UniProtKB/Swiss-Prot annotation:
GO biological process terms held by the UniProt record: translation
Protein name: Small ribosomal subunit protein uS9
Keyword Ribosomal protein in annotation: yes
Annotated source species: Vibrio atlanticus (strain LGP32) (Vibrio splendidus (strain Mel32))
Superkingdom, taxonomy of origin: Bacteria
Keyword Ribosomal protein: yes
GO MF, any single term: RNA binding
């Protein structure tokens, strides 16, 4: 382990990401694959890069990320949250900018559970008058 390595944990929906940041050339490795290989959708790649672009450190830091659980969108959100936390550990003066952009807050929205007697979480069975 490098001595100048910073860590952040991010969560979103049912995904959890562990993010390690160290000074480097801007390489992003997710589960031993590059960002472009891991996320095919451009929107997911954009979500992951948002905190780095905000603080203009895209080319100065290397990121090593492990993420598990959930789907593509949840994993991208978890990685963004983890990167934000690691950046705050790296430099506490970045916190106000990240907070203003809304990246520090954990997005608490998750799937609502299915209820007994209903078809889905809120979808009721079809009503027949006769």
């Amino acid at each position: 382990m490098a001595e100048n390595q910073y860590y952040g944990t991010g969560r979103r929906k049912s995904s959890a990401a562990r993010v390690f940041i160290k000074p480097g050339s801007g390489e992003i490795v997710i589960n031993k694959r590059s960002l472009d290989v891991y996320f095919g959708r451009p929107t997911s790649r954009m979500v992951v890069k948002q905190p780095l672009e905000l603080v203009e450190l895209t080319e100065k830091l290397d990121l090593y990320i492990t993420v598990s659980g959930g789907g593509i969108s949840g994993q991208a959100g978890a990685i963004r949250h983890g990167i934000t936390r690691a950046l705050m550990e790296y430099d506490e003066t970045l916190r106000p900018a990240l907070r203003a952009a809304g990246y520090v807050t954990r997005d608490a929205r998750c799937v609502e559970r299915k209820k007994v007697g209903l078809r889905k979480a809120r979808r009721k069975p079809q009503f027949s008058k006769r």
